[in-house]
Amino acid sequence: AGTNCYYLTFKSQEAVDNVFKDAEAMGLKVIRVWGNLDVGVKTGTTDSEGKPVFTNNNDGSGEKDGVYFQYFDKDLGKPVTNFGEDGIKKLDYALYQAEKHGMKLLITFTNYWDAFGGMGQYVKWAEELGITGLKKDDFYTNETLKGWYKDYINGLLNHTNPYTNRKLKDEPSVFAW
């Protein structure tokens, strides 16, 4: 049996630990989590809580609890992955806990809905380069959007989890993506 826990990759370690304890007590074996939390353009400013501020977000303020996985870097002209404490390291910790509790994660790397950025955020990133008129469905056919997505996946799969010292592509706690 399994469940969906979209917030597992942006909450505190204590919250993640509690989710896994509860899931283990219920006999769950698979948890679907979001491996995407895409935001717009980093402004270089912070809010009153010290979190970075982003513009051109597909989903409200973009970040969730100060966590974001990708943002658009105007200087580079492409999305950049955040592997830090307020980024992919949250997914790393969830994978570590999944293995510790004998579970596996089904990781989504993007979504069609606007929540967490998704395909719509890729369209907004393209607008930053002057590529206009795209819709979410163009994610499947536009070479720029597809290239960015492939770069994201390649970076994730070859990223070494600091908790397990394994690349994501070698993590035994991954059920699927």
How should each PLM-predicted stretch be described?
Residues 2-177:
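Active-site mouth of glycoside hydrolases
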